[in-house]
From Swiss-Prot:
Catalysis performed (reactions): [eIF5A protein]-L-lysine + spermidine = [eIF5A protein]-deoxyhypusine + propane-1,3-diamine
Positions of NAD(+) binding: 104-108, 130-132, 136, 237, 284, 309-310, 343-344
Record has Iron as a keyword: no
Biological role stated in the UniProt entry: Catalyzes the NAD-dependent oxidative cleavage of spermidine and the subsequent transfer of the butylamine moiety of spermidine to the epsilon-amino group of a specific lysine residue of the eIF-5A precursor protein to form the intermediate deoxyhypusine residue. Also able to produce homospermidine from putrescine.
Binding site for spermidine: 135-136, 242, 289, 315-317, 324-330
Transmembrane regions listed in the UniProt entry: none
Entry's Gene Ontology molecular function annotations: deoxyhypusine synthase activity
Family in the record: Belongs to the deoxyhypusine synthase family.
Signal sequence, renumbered to the chain: none
Cofactor: NAD(+)
Protein name: Deoxyhypusine synthase
Active-site residue list: 330
Keywords associated with the record: Hypusine biosynthesis, NAD, Transferase
Amino acid sequence: MEEDRVLSSVHSTVFKESESLEGKCDKIEGYDFNQGVNYPKLLRSMLTTGFQASNLGDVIDVVNQMLEWRLSDETIAPEDCSEEEKDPAYRESVKCKIFLGFTSNLVSSGVRETIRYLVQHHMVDVIVTTTGGVEEDLIKCLAPTFKGDFSLPGAYLRSKGLNRIGNLLVPNDNYCKFEDWIIPIFDQMLKEQKEESVLWTPSKLLARLGKEINNESSYLYWAYKMNIPVFCRGLTDGSLGDMLYFHSFRTSGLVIDVVQDIRAMNGEAVHATPRKTGMIILGGGLPKHHICNANMMRNGADYAVFINTGQEFDGSDSGARPDEAVSWGKIRGSAKTVKVYCDATIAFPLLVAETFASKREQSCEHKT
């Protein structure tokens, strides 16, 4: 009798009755290759694959929500709307304002071409990057970056004048070509500052470099052409900073005003209303925080997508999940957010394929 009681207790513990999840959660099911190779369906199946594949599927959903949102989706509040904002045609034309941030290593990689595609077709509204994210774009117009290996010895590469970025190799000659190209531009900027009272800011400098490079492979060129602002808070950290340093010895006096740029950057968020704002941030560091901080000025972004491999246990901003930014007012509590823990060189091209690129293809097909 006692044994039966114990067995019954153990049985009820092991086989505890479950709450039904039917209709509440997606069933986990991967792509069936018996259907043939269909890449759009494969990408859509990520949502129900599990782990970071599901997070990638969620990222795709959130970005598509950014792209599909229109002011006409919102209820009109007459007391808060201008006459223009009450017009149905105007409301249908107002889209989400998208901030794109990325670190320099992604421009060193082939993700540069994905970024260039977005900028070329004016699919994003504001860009924030690091100095490396600027100079690597320009340098690639002058000379290529090559595939190497993560394990190549640093001392050996140094003896050959080769710089390693992960498993990429950048010959030091590339930076020599960069110096030859950019110093005359600094000279001309200084002349315009003195003779025409031009007030240079980091974003004005980057627009000028985009104009001067005049190369369609460059995202900076397309940002200049499309009048998309590119902000770089840490302008002097990198080869571009080295060039400014060397130039200051040749002829002093070139001034670049960062205060005007913080007003401009924060203004992009503050004056976005009545638009919603969305953040797509690849990697962490300065671009991630600069975009989030600007959106704090408007009580937070409405959509946020983070793609990086950073962890939050060390308290770094780079590794923080979107929910931490909610606590600061940088992302709204009601926002659609997701972070995918993945190398952005893998995740971002797949994301663009199933969002920006597919929607552009559909739009082109509809027009024809």
